[in-house]
């Protein structure tokens, strides 16, 4: 476990490592659970998210590189601007206004509906390896990682629009 004070750059680097490890382990564990139960279930989703969280915490605690140079003020400024721009682009992909749903960019209209379809399809417990929900009788060849992770969050009780 790292001892002493950590720089902001070290904390950001370790947090990013922890989040990537947590997400990856949750997805891999979820897919293993889905294969063993012929579809993802709520207990499988909880187990997957829990194992991902544990792996992410361990990665955060033990991923310190003592030889990594400290970030400069310009590096931190660039990371902050990138973080703000990313938050702006992804935080409001889908949001409610009154009784209607809206999207931030009309360019996301077709793509977002595809992702929502995949998330709901996985969360409903589709048999694994699933067929394409769009093309009948064709195995799914789409990279499912992010959509599968969001389906785990849906099964854990998080609303789709928040994931």
Stretches with model-predicted labels:
Residues 84-163:
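Active-site lumenal/periplasmic loops and adjacent helix-entry segments of GT-C-fold
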Residues 1-72, 76:
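Membrane-embedded, hydrophobic transmembrane alpha-helices
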Residues 71-89:
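Internal/C-terminal transmembrane anchor helices
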């Amino acid at each position: 476990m790292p001892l002493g004070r950590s720089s902001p750059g070290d904390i950001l680097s370790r947090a990013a490592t922890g989040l990537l490890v947590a997400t990856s382990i949750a997805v891999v564990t979820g897919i293993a659970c889905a294969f063993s139960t012929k579809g993802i279930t709520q207990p499988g989703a909880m187990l997957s998210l829990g194992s991902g969280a544990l792996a992410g915490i361990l990665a955060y605690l033990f991923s310190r590189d003592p030889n990594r140079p400290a970030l400069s003020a310009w590096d931190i400024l660039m990371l902050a601007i990138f973080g703000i721009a990313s938050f702006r682009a992804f935080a409001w992909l889908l949001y409610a206004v009154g009784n209607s749903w809206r999207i931030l960019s009309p360019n996301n209209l077709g793509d977002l509906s595809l992702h929502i379809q995949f998330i709901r399809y996985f969360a409903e417990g589709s048999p694994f390896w699933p067929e394409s929900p769009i093309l009948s009788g064709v195995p799914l060849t789409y990279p499912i990682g992010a959509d599968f992770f969001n389906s785990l969050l849906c099964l854990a009780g998080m609303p789709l629009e928040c994931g």
